Curated annotation (Swiss-Prot):
Entry keyword set: Ribonucleoprotein, Ribosomal protein, RNA-binding, rRNA-binding
GO CC, alphabetical: large ribosomal subunit
Family indicated by similarity: Belongs to the universal ribosomal protein uL2 family.
Keyword Ribonucleoprotein: yes
Region of interest (Disordered), residue spans: 224-274
Gene Ontology terms, MF aspect: rRNA binding; structural constituent of ribosome; transferase activity
Any Pfam family: Ribosomal_L2_C
Listed name of the protein: Large ribosomal subunit protein uL2
Gene from which this protein is expressed: rplB
Organism: Pelotomaculum thermopropionicum (strain DSM 13744 / JCM 10971 / SI)
Purpose of the protein: One of the primary rRNA binding proteins. Required for association of the 30S and 50S subunits to form the 70S ribosome, for tRNA binding and peptide bond formation. It has been suggested to have peptidyltransferase activity; this is somewhat controversial. Makes several contacts with the 16S rRNA in the 70S ribosome.
Bias (Basic residues): 257-274
Amino acid sequence: MAIKKFKPTSPGRRFVTVSDFEEITRTEPEKSLVEPLKKSGGRNAQGRITVRHRGGGHKRLYRIIDFKRDKDGIPAKVASIEYDPNRSARIALLHYADGEKRYIIAPAGLEVGQTVVSGPDADIKAGNCLPLKNIPVGTMIHNIELYPNGGGKLVRSAGASAQLMAKEGKYANIRMPSGEMRLLLQECRATIGQVGNVEHENITIGKAGRKRWLGIRPTVRGVVMNPVDHPHGGGEGRSPIGRNPVTPWGKPALGARTRKKKPGDRLIVKRRAR
């Protein structure tokens, strides 16, 4: 993948960069693996905004992705590499030997025509999925399960990869992309390799309208609001906040820790660097 730049023929064109999509081999998704995706506009079932700055954006179809990779021992041929509007990574369409079709997250280096397989006896090759106990120490992995048979939850974004650092007892020690060191059960599965579309982090949005295409609305600073709308609001002209910075709901902002305590915290060996 490469990044494409444009001549500055207009202010909106000047800073825009896009992917050249050279790895994409098919433009229409597999019909049997898509379903409708209704936009929520950031609202919950009561109709209240639970996520701000959401709304609009281009229509999308949801591609059903196989995060479990539980079809053991049956080889699958990579039929195509496709764009997925619902994630930063590319997806790969697999044609299994028994006729079934599934989408997976496309790892870096996976090409049309290659064969991938899941299961404890799979080779250590990009795109193959194995339990952590069968993966050599030092291997780069992605799409990692938090619990056995729970489906991949960790390390699924474009260009992301974790590393298997050690195995001890029933746990494997994983270094996450953030630098956090975490223990996971060795029965959990992971896919070999790094997630593809590595250059995604270097793309510049370039203009406000492109954010709107993605369904992201403007973010307004609290200090320019009225007092009824935000704790930072009000005052004559440009005025200071007048208190320690807080969220719209009055909780400490800018540096205050917000992570809740969870039972899984005991499996974190080393926190990420702040």
